[in-house]
C-alpha cells in the first residue's frame, strides 16, 4: 500500500506591470510605525514604493532600478542614491532588485491575512519590516516616470533613514 502526499502550489502571476496597496509595519529599536503606501512595479525596470502616512500625502518615495536604490524625502526635498553594493555594506541580509521585485509579487491568498516579515540589521539597529498587500492590479500602468532629482538636494542615506 502506498501513502500519498499532497503538495500545495502557489501560482505567481506573470506580469509586465503591477500596482497594489501595501500596509507597512516598521519596528526599529523602541519605535513602531504603521504606514499606508502603494507599490508600483514595471517588471525588470523600476519599483516605486510611495509612503503616505497621513491623508494620502506622499512623504517618502523609494525608487529601485536594477542597479540602484533612490530614497526621496518629499517633505524636506532631499534624496539619497546608492548602488546595491553600498546599501548591502550598511544592512544585512543583502538586498537586490530581484529580491524586491519578487517580494512585490508575493502570492496573496484572499482568505488569509498573510503578512511578509523581513528583519534587517544595521550596526546597532534592528529594523523589522512587515508588509500586507491588497488591491493588486496587473498590467494597468503606463510607462514609468522617474522623480526629477533637480528639485531635491542630494544627501547621505543615513540622514534620511537612521541606519
Per-range role (PLM):
Residues 46-97:
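An acidic-aromatic
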Residues 36-40, 131-133:
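Hydrophobic/aromatic beta-strand elements that line small-molecule binding cavities or substrate pockets
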Residues 12-29:
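A short, Trp-centered hydrophobic/proline-enriched beta-strand micro-motif
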Residues 6-9:
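Bacterial signal peptide processing site
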Residues 113-163:
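Non-transmembrane domains of secretory- and envelope-associated proteins
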Residues 22-26, 49-52, 119-123:
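Short beta-strand segments that buttress and anchor functional surface loops
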Residues 82-124, 155-161:
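C-terminal low-complexity, charged extensions that often adopt amphipathic alpha-helices
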Residues 2-4:
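C-terminal motif of bacterial Sec signal peptides marking the signal peptidase cleavage site
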Amino acid at each position: 500500500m502506498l501513502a500519498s502526499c499532497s503538495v500545495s502550489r502557489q501560482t505567481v502571476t506573470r506580469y509586465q506591470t503591477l500596482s497594489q496597496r501595501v500596509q507597512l509595519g516598521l519596528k526599529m529599536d523602541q519605535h513602531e510605525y504603521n504606514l499606508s503606501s502603494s507599490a508600483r512595479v514595471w517588471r525588470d525596470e523600476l519599483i516605486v514604493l510611495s509612503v503616505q502616512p497621513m491623508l494620502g500625502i506622499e512623504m517618502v518615495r523609494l525608487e529601485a532600478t536594477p542597479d540602484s536604490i533612490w530614497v526621496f524625502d518629499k517633505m524636506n526635498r532631499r534624496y539619497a542614491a546608492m548602488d546595491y553594493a553600498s546599501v548591502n555594506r550598511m544592512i544585512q541580509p543583502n538586498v537586490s532588485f530581484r529580491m524586491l521585485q519578487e517580494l512585490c509579487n508575493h502570492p496573496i491568498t484572499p482568505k488569509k491575512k498573510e503578512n511578509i516579515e523581513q528583519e534587517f540589521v544595521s550596526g546597532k539597529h534592528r529594523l523589522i519590516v512587515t508588509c500586507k498587500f491588497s488591491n493588486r492590479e496587473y498590467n494597468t500602468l503606463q510607462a514609468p516616470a522617474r522623480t526629477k532629482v533637480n528639485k531635491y538636494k542630494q544627501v547621505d542615506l543615513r540622514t534620511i533613514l537612521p541606519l
